[in-house]
Each structure stands twice: as C-alpha cells, then as structure tokens.
C-alpha cells in the first residue's frame, strides 16, 4: 500500500511554508530598507556617508581607521545575513551608522532640554524681578499722604505792636498773665506762648550775631602782664629794696629826759608842737632855777635817831635854794650810825624830788 503523496494529501507543502516565510521576510526587509533610506536622506550624517565623506565624533580620524570600521561592520552583517536574507550588508551598515549618528543627537537633545529649562527659569526670574522693580517704582512715584499742617497764624499790626510792647516789659509770662493777654488780643494762650518763645529765640540769635561781629572786628586784647618778684638769681637770694626798707628796725628818735633843763619833746613835727615844747622847756628852766630842796641836818646815833632822821627827811624848800642838789650829809641817824655820803639827783631821794617837779610841769 502506497502512502499518498504529500502534495496530493495536503493542500500545501513544506516548501510552500518556507516560501511564505521567505516572502514575508523579504517584504518586511524591503519595508525596513525603505524606511531606512527615508531616514538616511533626511539625516545630514547619512548624506555625508552617501557622498563618501568622513565621519567624526568630535575629532578627525584617519581613513585607515574608518576602513577598518567599515570592514568590521560588513563582516558582522555577513555573519548574521543567513537569518535575514532581506537585509543586505550595506543596509545593515547604514542601520548601525544611523544608530551611531542618532545617539549623539539624543545626547545633544538632553543639554538642549536642560538649557531650555534654565532659560525659562531665568526668564521667569527676570520677569518676577522686573515686576517687583515696577511695583517698587510705582510705590515710590505714588505720592505719600503728607500730614496736614495747620495754617500759619497771621497777626495783625495792632496785635504785634501790643505783643512787642509787653515783651519789652516782661520777657516771661505766667499762665494767668498769658491768658489775660490772649483774651485782650483775641488770641489763644498757645499762640501767645509760641509767639513769646519765638521772640526770645530771635533776641538770643541777634545777641549771638552781634557778639560774633564785634569779636571779628575788634582786635584781641593784649596779654596781661603780671610782675613776678625774683627771689633767687644765679643761686643767690635776691633782696628787694622794699624788703630792705621794711627790714630796718622801726625806731623813733627821742631825746632822754633832762631833769635840769627839760628840753623839748621830739615827737612832734608841726610848728605849734615845737612852740609848745619850747614854752614848756622855758617854764621848767625858770621853775628849777628858783625852786630848791634841802634836807636839814639832824642828830644821829642810837635808837632815838629814828625820829630825828624822819624829821630830817622832810624837804626844805627855799626861794634861794642852792640848785637841784639835795643835802643829805646829816643822815647819821639811819642804821648803825655810819657816816652819810651826799647823794646826786640820780639817787632815790633825788628821783623822788624830781618826780614832784615833773608832776607840776605836766599839770601845767
């Protein structure tokens, strides 16, 4: 029994299946090649490859290196060609080259995206800054609401005259006085107070300006000289004439009293005093020449001689006396009865007699 033929038994054979697969692969390869050619014509790097130009990845390479690359790619395409008969080695090479050219383009697109984003952020920032500047400029240009000042008070001539007259009389006013003046001038107390303050300040400024003008025109005063006494010169003390004058002892020349003639006193310098002193001296001389004192002689010896001596001590004055001497020759009764010696006026007895004479002159 013969087996039926595979051709007759089945509507298709293995060859038909293989042919269908080959046709499908061929169709798919043709479509892919057309698509690749479309991309090659649009890409500038593929145009350069078709024209036989050199490829460079940022730097120029030798022709030998490019030939080696192309041969390596062709060998890879020949090794893998049995699986895909529709792809020729040239198409595979173009595919690899397209991938190699498209990769840098993708890498180039990434910085562009980053650059675009940075540009957009910068533009946004600039726009915000410009908006802020514009807003600040608008606010600065906008007029600020100014505080409304009170209108300035204008005084009449009569009011100013009265205020000036009162200011000359009294520079500072108390509260009641200010109220009274304000009511008389039909002003407020605050207005009067401010007017007086301004007037005082004006007077102060006028005085300052006047003093400055006088100081500018007037010459400066000469330096003051003060006499300083020199006490030491060249290591030696200096004595001034005034010190010498005051250093001498203070003394007044006066003659001693003379119990005989009683000369004139030397304390007066006037003519009247000199005349009075001369008259007193003449009277004293006349009195001393006409009046004398004498002691009579008395008995002496023993205890009974005391009374006799006492009696003998009484002065005997006579008009024709023998001068200023006192006779005391008979004073033997004193003591143990020794001999007595005559005494001069300078002794104690003579001094007592002279004292009586001086008292009479002073009384005169």
UniProtKB/Swiss-Prot annotation:
Composition-biased stretches (Basic and acidic residues): 135-144
Transcription listed as a keyword: yes
Subcellular localization: Nucleus
Main location, first listed in the record: nucleus
GO terms under biological process: CD4-positive, alpha-beta T cell differentiation; cell differentiation; cell fate specification; gland morphogenesis; leukocyte homeostasis; leukocyte migration; lymph node development; macrophage differentiation
Segments forming a coiled coil: none
DNA-binding region: 148-207
InterPro entries associated with the record: HD (IPR001356), HD_metazoa (IPR020479), Homeobox_CS (IPR017970), Homeobox_NK-like (IPR050394), Homeodomain-like_sf (IPR009057)
Protein role: Transcription factor.
Family statement drawn from the similarity comment of this UniProt entry: Belongs to the NK-2 homeobox family.
Protein's UniProt name: Homeobox protein Nkx-2.3
Organism per entry: Homo sapiens
